[in-house]
Amino acid sequence: MTTVKVKENEPFEIAMRRFKRSIEKTGLLTELRAREFYEKPTAVRKRKHAAAVKRTYKRLRSQMLPPKLY
């Protein structure tokens, strides 16, 4: 459970911003969205495999950059 203690004379907007930042850092919203609906195990494997392929191609593209001419 993420908690944020509001400091004395602290505006609500700043406390809300700190709360949102802490939620984002813990990854709570992404996990909540992932668990909102049931996902079949085959769909999970397929999604993870596609992400791994995408990461691999991204890494290869960055390694094969042509030399800069300037």
UniProtKB/Swiss-Prot annotation:
Coiled coil: none annotated. GO terms for cellular component: ribonucleoprotein complex; ribosome. GO terms for molecular function: structural constituent of ribosome. GO terms for biological process: translation. Keywords: Ribonucleoprotein, Ribosomal protein. InterPro entries: Ribosomal_bS21 (IPR001911), Ribosomal_bS21_sf (IPR038380). HAMAP family: Ribosomal_bS21 (MF_00358). Belongs to the bacterial ribosomal protein bS21 family. This is Small ribosomal subunit protein bS21. It comes from Nitrosomonas europaea (strain ATCC 19718 / CIP 103999 / KCTC 2705 / NBRC 14298). The gene is rpsU.
